[in-house]
Amino acid sequence: MSKSLFITFEGTEGCGKSTQIELLAKTLRVLGYPVHTLREPGGTPVGEEVRHTLKHSKTNVAMTPEAELLLVNASRAQLVREVIRPALAVGEVVLCDRFYDSTTAYQGYGRGLDLALVKSVIDFAVGNTRPDLTLFLHVPPEVSAERLLSRQSILPFIRDRMEEGDRHFFARVAKGYEAIAAAEPDRVRVVDGAGTIEVVCAKIWEYVQPVLPRVGRW
């Protein structure tokens, strides 16, 4: 099998994941690495339909935590088999905006579903496809809330169900991420996401650079 690298980005809403993925992808491509960027839920035609249902559909108001868990992992199962595994098989660097740690944090800690049940569903969806490195962009709740308000003021007509939780919900999600990072320190690296874009980018590079030798360049 070709050398490859699977990096996931995690964090609460407004932590800056999408911006940092774009910057890292650009840097890696300039250096000659084959890069594939993805997002969850989504990344495939099936996954994008699920994403719309989970986040923006008018019909999701009464969605239960159990349904949310299954839909997220249906999208993930498709993404793993249709995109992630093939990309890794040919030696690409895969950068994914969220992966299964989001499910543990949001549906497990946030929604209060049994963590053992959540893990079993995740395991079924991803099999042995696991990230080599996870970057958890940690921001204080007040920073996250401020960034969300700013984003919503720019896009006021786009409803996102996953941004509608109260502060207690997002506090539980943050606690979930902290627990994950504490349990797997070799895989999960905590990055202070409250700094400037440039400072956060530099810190991410400190964690990414040591794992790059395992990947071939073009």
Where are these regions (language model features)?
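Conserved lysine of the Walker
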Residues: 17
